[in-house]
Amino acid sequence: MIEFVKGTIDYVCPQYVVIENGGVGYQVYSPNPFIYQINKQETIYTYHYIKEDAFSLYGFQTREEKALFTKLLNVTGIGPKGALAILASGDPGAVISAIEREDEAFLIKFPGVGKKTARQIILDLKGKLADVVPEMIGNLFNHEDHIQVETQQTALDEALEALSVLGYGDREIKKVYPLLKEEKNLTTDQYVKKALQKMLK
């Protein structure tokens, strides 16, 4: 079991990053790959997902993120893609709060989460997340933003592609596109977070 990979970011795309360590490139799926910068040294905490002939690595910036991902995977009806979409919201505190309040309306805003799955999330996780994110709730994903040299349109296009990978449909993406166009000088990571904030209102 690989607890984490420490190395240099070699490649970033909407689905995953490649981190190189000892001449080996590890393909790691991430909630928002654009938080990473190419050629930068990083430590990614990994989770192995094995199902039949599928073997995948999922990676997170903190052990707390990884623990929350693991908890979500234990919920019937939630797979890796669904768990990543929930984590990509950038506000785990709001997710945990919704679970504790039994706020199904908030949870069904995530791709692939219907009323039945939302109810299952609440049944399985309510009262069981305090050990996952102690005093870090609310600030868990507020990492220092990376400064990237990229044009605004390129960043926006990459963000829209990332939203599609997370499972959001064309209708939802088109709805937030005009709002994102009004934002200036944002990185891809910031565009994704801004879009998810607007979608989850």
Swiss-Prot record:
Chain residue ranges for the region called Domain II: 62-140
Pfam families membership: HHH_5, RuvA_C, RuvA_N
This protein's UniProt keywords: Cytoplasm, DNA damage, DNA recombination, DNA repair, DNA-binding
DNA repair among keywords: yes
Its job: The RuvA-RuvB-RuvC complex processes Holliday junction (HJ) DNA during genetic recombination and DNA repair, while the RuvA-RuvB complex plays an important role in the rescue of blocked DNA replication forks via replication fork reversal (RFR). RuvA specifically binds to HJ cruciform DNA, conferring on it an open structure. The RuvB hexamer acts as an ATP-dependent pump, pulling dsDNA into and through the RuvAB complex. HJ branch migration allows RuvC to scan DNA until it finds its consensus sequence, where it cleaves and resolves the cruciform DNA.
Similarity annotation: Belongs to the RuvA family.
Name under which the protein is recorded: Holliday junction branch migration complex subunit RuvA
Biological source species: Bacillus pumilus (strain SAFR-032)
Gene name of the encoded protein: ruvA
